[in-house]
Structures are given as C-alpha cells and as structure tokens.
Amino acid sequence: MNFNLSQIPERNHKPRTSGITMVMDKGLSVEEAKNFMSVGNPHVDIVKLGFGTSFVTPNLEEKLEVYRSYNIPVYFGGTLFEAFLVRNQFDDYISVCKNFGISYMEVSDGSITIPHAEKCGYIEKLTKHGTVLSEVGSKDAAHIIPPYKWIELMRAELNAGASYVIAEAREAGNVGIYRGTGEVREGLVQEILTQIPGEKILWEAPQKAQQLYFIELLGCNVNLGNIAPTEVLPLESMRIGLRGDTFHLFLNKENA
C-alpha cells in the first residue's frame, strides 16, 4: 500500500484461497490487458475470458501470455465448455485447454440441460487436468431453483472435485442469486450458507450494490466474481473500508 492507515481489515495475501477477485474480460486487447495488469495485478486472482470470446479473440495466445507473466490464472467462460459439450466435443475442449496452457476450467450448464450426475462426471474428469470451478444456476431468469436444490447441487459438485462453486448471475447480475432488478435473493444466499462453506463459493457480483451486500455479510475476504476490469480498484477500496459505502464497516475493529 502507498501509505500507512490504521484500522484497515486484513486481506488474505496472494496466492489466496479466499478473498478472491475474479475478473471478467469480455474482449480487452493485448495492450488493454497490459494496462489493466499494470494497476490491477495485486488485486486480481483469476481472469475469465467471458462466454465464447476466446473463440473470436485475435492474438489470444499473446493476451494469455500477458496474464501469465503476472501469474494470473485464466479460464474460458463456462458457455464455451457448453458449446463444446453440446457438439459432442468434450475431448476437443480438453485439448484446446492444454494447447493454450489453460489449467483452470469452468463446468456449467446454464445454457444447456444435462443430467446432474453427468455434469459431476465432467467435473471429476477435468480435475485430472487442472483446477475446476463449477457454476450452479440457470441463465434463464424464468428458471427458479429452490434453495434446497442449490445446496444439493453445490455439495455434489464440490464432492466431485470442484475447487469452488460459482453462484450464477450472468454478466448483468440479474439471474440466479439475484432478482431481475439485480436485488439479492437474501433468503436464498443465507440458506446456502447454512450448508455450504462460504470460502468455497465464488459469488458473481458485477453490480456495486451486490458487492457491498456480500462484503457486509461475509467480510472483506469474500470471494467475488464477474468484476469488470475498471471496477477492480473500486472493489478493493470497498473491501477495506475506503469507499463511502463501507467507510464505517471496519472502524474500531481489529479484523474484518
């Protein structure tokens, strides 16, 4: 940090297993990725190349190398995994990840329907090739999953070998754990947390109000994802009480 301030909550140090910030890169150029890393690197843990953008990104290898040079793991969005799966190209997906040096993989079923046991089978297979994040929740706002089912799915996917379960929100933050307005389904979140360890959940929270909710609920070391590159420093400031929304949250406290 650039100067000394007392009563700042202690953030877990990188490489960390909780307090993760996952950034969604929806199409940064190589130069933009370099510029982003020059300021964002200390506060970014994982970068996701959103949905299928990796298929159409020029100079993909060069961009991946930028993130690699900062020891930031990158993974392809779960929609790309589903695109391979629906075309019966699961083995090709593994090959593509290997060819591009991708060791983090997302397993999701937000756009397609597959039996849950089959999804868990893919998680188990991919753990042999790297770190697996599995996403729970539908991208269809009309598809409401009851809390007990969220818990059941998350538990099974963690047991299958997922390092984290991602709570679906899309890049807009208006499905899954959120209502169409972006408001948090608080009852759902709190019920999930009675059964699933918070440090194993990566909450997609693209909106500031959503990030604030989880920081207030779980502290500065909550795992948050789908953060825009331009929002990394604002989020880090909010995590440690240096933004108006959380200014008083950690004052007179030893730890977050």
Where are these regions (language model features)?
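Active-site mouth loops of central-metabolism enzymes
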Residues: 17-31, 50-53, 75-89, 135-149
